[in-house]
Amino acid sequence: MKCEHIIWDWNGTLLDDVWLSVQSINTVLSRYELPQITTSRYLDIFTFPVIEYYKLLGFNFDTDPFEKVGTEFINEYTYNQYLPKLHKDLIKVLKEINDLKVSQSLVSAATQKMLDKLIHYHKLANYFETVIGQDNHYAYGKEDTVSKWLDARSLDPSHVLFIGDTIHDHEVAINSGMQSLLISHGHTSRERLLKTGTIVLPNLNSFIYWFKESTQ
């Protein structure tokens, strides 16, 4: 496998924030007297665009617009945004990728402002060539921003590896002509990820071993 650049997804892939997403949405659900969800249920239904996930949760957008409910979730999440930790072995993996002379970037469905704050807080900026966020907090998806980023680069998309934790991440990679790899410690169950047919690994440590073997 030839790989000149890696694009990492942020939430779930590098940041261990599933618990906060479940906690935050349950706070909002209780506000609307809707059933709480378990982490297992969350991993089985979370999807992009997240408006579809909100529909599965039971929200009625005729009475409570998605923009209102989505903002309430973001407010809950943002209040605790510095509590989630980085996934185990992340710093080691980022350093090893740099040592292999492979450049790295980061993309998220979060706003650019939130993403920049978190990258600074976790002292990760030096590892990434580019940090790509969104201009709104409604998490419609990443495909447009990633596509524009690729268009502005001289990279061959087939030599770029996109690493994420959702089916949407896989779709972004394939639709943009990139290689795809998924890690199952994030926002989607392993069973759902395997249905994409792409490589699914359990954690970051297993990824670095796979990457070294695959790029020899």
State where each predicted segment sits.
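N-terminal helical cap/lid subdomain that shapes the substrate entry/recognition surface
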Residues: 3-91
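Glycine-rich phosphate-binding loop signature in dinucleotide/nucleotide-binding domains
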Residues: 1, 99-102, 152-159, 214-215
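Conserved Lys-Pro-Asp/Glu-containing loop-to-beta segment of HAD-superfamily phosphomonoesterases
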Residues: 5, 142-171
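Short, acidic loop-to-helix structural element flanking the phosphoryl-transfer center
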Residues: 79-106, 112, 116, 143
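Acidic, Mg2+-coordinating phosphoryl-transfer loop and its flanking beta/alpha structural elements
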Residues: 161-201
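Short beta->alpha linker loops
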Residues: 45, 85-89, 110, 137, ...
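A short, structured active-site edge motif that brings together acidic residues
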Residues: 42, 125-140
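Conserved H-loop
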Residues: 35, 125-129, 156, 201
